[in-house]
Amino acid sequence: PIMSDEPEDVEDITSICGGLNINIGTLNQRSIQAMFRAGEKAASLGHVLLLDPVGAGASALRTNTAVDLMEQLPFTVIRGNISEIKTLALGSGKTRGVDADVSDAVSDENLDSAVAFVKDFAQRSHAIVAVTGAIDLVSDGQRCFVIRNGRPEMGKITGTGCQLSGMMTAFVVANPDRRLEAAAAAVCAMGLAGEIGWSRMAQGDGNSTYRNRIIDAIYNMDGAALDKGAKYEVR
């Protein structure tokens, strides 16, 4: 992958890539311009586009930029935590920086309504919508994967969501005829890596070690391990 945010560079780079992951984490006026130019180029080439609306709801600039991107570009996938996705769906919301607001969390108690919400937003946005958290939801508007892989400790490592967005872009690009399943598989793989990584932690290990354990688990994971370890149902 190449991470480019120079407006004069992004069209050339986008042309040689199979997919584009637009992550608004490091937002500024130059990167906003680059995002739109790269997105327009990717759309013209029929490439996979993924939007990661990092921190949408935390500031007016982030919210407005994410909404504008969603309205002007034909995203294949939109991935975020529940607060970020609610911000896009409703046009406003609240997050705690890059973290979801506790009151928004998907749980067994509100699962039915959360699934209905994600399906509705996927239909309206014409995109696969992936909501990640303690319980992950991935929907194309018709079906919804409810995924239960992962560890709560993953939430203490900054960047796991961004890492997942990169993986998801690659999974969807590699499986053009099964995009929903590919997006769900990426979520399962990331969560499973968190489980495997945590099982290999030793006394005295901390976040830095855990981050690397997750990366190692992803690197060493194959299809058989993913099939065996994935925890999901389809609604």
Place the predicted regions along the sequence by residue.
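Charged C-terminal helix
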Residues: 192-235
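Active-site cofactor/substrate anionic-group-binding motifs, chiefly glycine-
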Residues: 1-45
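Short, well-structured alpha-helical segments that form the helix of a local strand-helix-strand
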Residues: 117-122, 179-194, 211-215
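Hydrophobic beta-strand scaffold residues
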Residues: 1, 49-50, 129
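Short pre-catalytic strand/loop immediately N-terminal to key active-site residues, enriched for Gly-Thr
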Residues: 147-159
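Short, small-residue alpha-helix embedded
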Residues: 156-188
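Conserved phosphate/ATP/ADP-binding segment of small-molecule kinases
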Residues: 63-144
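Glycine/small-residue-rich loop that forms an oxyanion/phosphate-binding "nest" at active or ligand-binding sites
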Residues: 31-80
